[in-house]
Amino acid sequence: MRFATQKCTLKRFLTAAAVVAVLTACGCSRPVNNPRPLADYAENTLFSSFSGRSPKTLDPQVSYSSDETIYTYTIYEPPYGYHYLKRPYEVIPKTAERVVTPVYLDKNGRELAPGADVSASAFSRYVIPIKKGIRYAPHPAFAKDAAGNYRYHRLTDAVAEKLTNPLDLPEKGTRELTADDYVYGIKRIGDVRTVSPVLGILSSHIVGLKAFSETFAQALKEAEAAGRPAPDIRDFPVEGVKARDSHTLEITVYGRYPQFANWLTMAFFAPVPWEATAFYGANPLLKKNNVTLEAWPVGTGPYRLAS
């Protein structure tokens, strides 16, 4: 009786499987919801979904979409990158001279001896040497006149209204990458006007970033209420972020956070020259023509955006 029951069950299974196979075969020949003709799939073509306008933003402290990384990671250069041919991926220097080992500090800021108790580490300090001789792609933001004044940090309405591509301006300049550019980029994460998606998590790791963000936001409100120009983020320090000299970047984070080396490979930590934000803020009419950092990045990478 037990064998007969198993046999009957097997028959039902085979019958059901045959029905499914027939239906599947029919479905493969004529898909119900196929968005493209079958002939399109005969070629070696990659199809991908596309939603909205892409790229939406190329601001390195804001961009967080995979559709934008092909631009941001070839135009901008964080301190570190990855060796993608190694398994597992290895963090390697990009604009940094080397991948550094952090110095661990106690709650009083004193350096701990090697092999000290992990629980005694209140802070980790990364002192990153930046390579010399790296320069920004030519851009009108850096252009100066014979007297050394920036040519395009003040634009008339007549010029700004007609400008749709900043590279159409006749004069361009460049300068060397410095550690201050990385400090400026990190401060932009804390600037509420930037609306960086990583401010929340990084403010809990980078010493002083939360306090900077709150202090600067208050300064913006006070300036607006008094009818004064917006303050400059360069005038507001972040306790744990500083340039020791022109080519040495120092970042201090809370506790031991080895994943911070991976953060330093991301475009959020790309350098931004203050001249770029000064240029794009030279006249409000530029934003109407989409002449902004979101659309026209200024970086040190091997590529630049052109039209």
Pin down the residues of each PLM region.
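Bacterial N-terminal signal peptides that target proteins for export
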Residues: F3-T15
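Bacterial N-terminal signal peptides
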Residues: A16-A25
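Bacterial signal peptide processing site
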Residues: G27-V32
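Short, well-ordered beta-strand elements
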Residues: A42-G52, S124-P129, Y182, L249-E250, ...
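Extracytoplasmic
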Residues: A42-N44, T74-Y76, K94-A96, S121-R125, ...
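N-terminal lobe/hinge region of extracytoplasmic solute-binding protein
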Residues: S48-V118, V298-T300, A306
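Gly/Pro-rich hinge or "lid" segments in bacterial periplasmic/extracellular proteins
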Residues: H83-K86, V207-T248, T252-S307
